[in-house]
C-alpha cells in the first residue's frame, strides 16, 4: 500500500514540475499518450522536449524571412540604381507567385513523406535567394531569386504547421500553435531590428548576408527535431493507418467543404479591409507630421508584435476551452472598430494605442487559421492543401486592399476610405457570426 502511494506522489510531482517548466504543457501530450484512446483514433503523441525546443527555435529564426524581405529589397535595389519600374516588376512577380503558389505548396507538403526535409529545402532555397540578391544584383538574377523566395515561402508555412501537428497531434495543437506564434512574433521583431541596424551601420547589401546567417541556426534547430517523432499521417490530417487508403479525400473534395469555403470568404473580406489600413494611417500621419511619421509607424508595427507575443499562448489554450468561434468573432469584431477609430482619432499616441486591436486580431489569426483548418480537414489527408486554400483567399484580399483604399482616398478622402474599409470588415464579421460553425470536435473540449 505504501509503495502505491509513493508511486502516485512521484507521478503527480513529476507532472507538476513538467507543467511549471514549460509554457506548452507537455503533460497534456503525455496524458494523451497514456490514455491510449485519443479522439478520432489518432495515434497518441509523445514528442521529446528536444524536438519541441527545436521547433521553437526553428520558428524563431525563419519568422522574418518566411514572408519576404519586405522593404529591405526596395531600399537595396534603389542603392543599386534600379528604376522604380524594375523594382515594381520584381516585387509584383514575387507577389504573383506567392498568390498562385499557396495551394500547390500546401498540396506538395501533403504529398511529402518528410515534412522536415521539405522545410529544410525551403530554407536552403531562401538562402540561395538571399545570396543571389547580394552577389549579383542584376535584373534576371534578382527576378529569379525573388520567384524562388516566394515559392519557398509558399511551402515553408504549411511545412511548419504540418511539423507541429505531426509532433503533438490534434489534442494539443492549439497550445502548440500559440507557442509558434509567440516565437514567430519575437523572432520577427528581433530579426527586423537586426536587419535594420545592419543596413544603417554597414550597407543595404549586408542585410541579405544577415538573412543567410539567421537561416544557418534555423537549419540546426530543424535538425534537432526528431524525424521519427513527426507522424506523417497526423501531419497531413490523414485518417488513422488502420483505415483504408480510400478514406483519404480527393484534393477536389475540399472545394465541397462548406465551412472551409465560408472561412475562406471571411478571410478574404478581412484582409481586403485590413491590409491597406496601416499604410493608409502612414500616409495620413506623414501629411500631418512628417517629422514624426517614421517613429509613429514603427511604433504601430511594434505594438501588435508585443501583443501577439504576449497573447498567443493564452489564445491557444482558450481555443480548447471556449472553442474556435468566440475567438474568431472577437478578432473579426476588432477590425471594424479599429477602422472607425482611425476616422475620428488624430493624436499619434492614441493611434499607436489603437494598434493593440491589430495585435489582438493578429494573435487570434496566427493560432486560429491553422487550427480551424486542422479541424475541418481532419481525416482527409489534405490539411496543408486546406491551408493553401485559405492562403490564396488571404492573398487575394490583401492584393486588392491597396487598390481599393487608394481609389477611395483619392476620390473621397481618407475618412471615407477608413469608413469603407470598416464596412467591409463588418460584412466579414456578419458572415462569421451567421454562417461560421464551431469546428472544435466535441471530444476535445477541455475537462
Features from the language model and the residues they span:
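Juxtamembrane intracellular "pre-TM" segments in multi-pass secondary transporters
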Residues: 36-52, 229-263
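Helix-loop boundary and gating motifs at the non-cytosolic
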Residues: 45-95, 261-262, 266, 271-285
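Interfacial helix-cap and linker-helix signal at transmembrane-aqueous boundaries
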Residues: 77-78, 108-109, 197-202, 285-286, ...
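Helix-to-loop junctions at the C-terminal end of transmembrane segments
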Residues: 101-114, 199, 311-323, 409
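Structural signature of the two symmetry-related core transmembrane helices
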Residues: 117-131, 212, 326-341
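Cytoplasmic helix-loop-helix junction between adjacent transmembrane helices
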Residues: 147-184, 372
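Symmetry-related core transmembrane helices of the 12-TM Major Facilitator Superfamily/SLC fold
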Residues: 206-223, 418-433
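A late C-terminal transmembrane helix in Major Facilitator Superfamily
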Residues: 382-411
Amino acid at each position: 500500500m505504501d509503495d502505491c502511494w509513493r508511486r502516485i506522489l512521484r507521478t503527480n510531482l513529476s507532472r507538476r514540475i513538467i507543467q511549471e517548466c514549460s509554457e506548452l504543457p507537455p503533460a497534456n501530450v503525455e496524458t494523451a499518450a497514456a490514455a491510449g484512446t485519443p479522439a478520432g483514433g489518432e495515434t497518441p503523441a509523445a514528442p521529446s522536449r528536444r524536438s519541441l525546443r527545436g521547433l521553437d527555435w526553428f520558428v524563431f529564426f525563419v519568422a522574418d524571412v518566411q514572408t519576404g524581405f519586405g522593404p529591405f529589397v526596395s531600399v537595396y535595389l534603389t542603392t543599386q540604381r534600379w528604376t522604380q519600374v524594375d523594382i515594381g516588376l520584381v516585387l509584383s512577380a514575387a507577389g504573383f507567385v506567392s498568390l498562385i503558389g499557396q495551394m500547390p505548396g500546401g498540396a506538395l507538403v501533403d504529398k511529402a513523406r518528410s515534412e522536415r526535409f521539405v522545410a529544410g529545402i525551403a530554407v536552403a532555397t531562401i538562402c540561395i535567394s538571399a545570396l543571389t540578391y547580394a552577389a549579383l544584383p542584376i535584373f534576371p538574377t534578382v527576378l529569379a531569386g525573388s520567384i524562388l523566395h516566394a515559392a519557398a515561402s509558399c511551402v515553408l508555412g504549411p511545412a511548419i504547421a504540418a511539423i507541429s501537428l505531426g509532433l503533438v497531434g490534434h489534442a494539443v495543437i492549439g497550445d502548440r500553435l500559440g507557442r509558434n506564434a509567440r516565437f514567430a512574433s519575437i523572432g520577427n521583431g528581433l530579426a527586423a531590428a537586426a536587419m535594420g541596424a545592419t543596413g544603417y551601420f554597414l550597407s543595404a547589401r549586408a542585410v541579405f548576408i544577415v538573412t543567410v546567417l539567421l537561416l544557418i541556426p534555423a537549419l540546426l534547430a530543424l535538425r534537432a527535431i526528431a524525424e521519427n517523432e513527426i507522424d506523417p499521417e497526423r501531419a497531413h490530417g490523414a485518417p488513422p493507418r488502420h483505415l483504408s487508403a480510400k478514406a483519404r479525400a480527393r484534393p477536389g473534395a475540399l472545394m465541397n467543404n462548406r465551412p472551409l469555403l465560408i472561412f475562406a470568404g471571411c478571410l478574404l473580406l478581412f484582409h481586403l479591409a485590413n491590409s491597406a489600413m496601416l499604410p493608409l494611417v502612414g500616409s495620413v500621419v506623414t501629411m500631418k507630421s512628417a517629422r514624426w511619421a517614421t517613429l509613429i509607424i514603427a511604433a504601430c508595427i511594434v505594438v501588435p508584435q508585443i501583443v501577439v507575443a504576449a497573447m498567443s499562448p493564452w489564445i491557444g489554450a482558450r481555443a480548447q476551452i471556449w472553442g474556435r468561434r468566440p475567438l474568431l468573432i472577437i478578432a473579426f469584431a476588432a477590425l471594424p472598430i479599429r477602422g472607425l477609430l482611425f476616422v475620428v482619432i488624430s493624436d499619434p499616441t492614441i493611434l499607436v494605442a489603437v494598434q493593440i486591436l491589430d495585435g489582438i486580431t493578429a494573435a487570434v489569426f496566427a493560432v486560429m487559421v491553422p487550427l480551424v483548418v486542422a479541424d475541418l480537414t481532419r481525416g482527409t489527408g489534405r490539411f496543408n492543401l486546406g491551408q493553401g486554400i485559405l492562403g490564396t483567399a488571404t492573398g487575394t484580399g490583401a492584393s486588392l486592399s491597396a487598390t481599393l483604399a487608394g481609389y477611395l482616398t483619392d476620390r473621397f478622402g481618407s475618412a471615407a476610405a477608413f469608413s469603407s474599409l470598416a464596412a467591409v470588415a463588418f460584412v466579414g464579421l456578419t458572415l462569421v457570426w451567421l454562417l461560421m460553425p464551431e469546428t472544435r470536435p466535441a471530444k476535445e473540449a477541455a475537462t
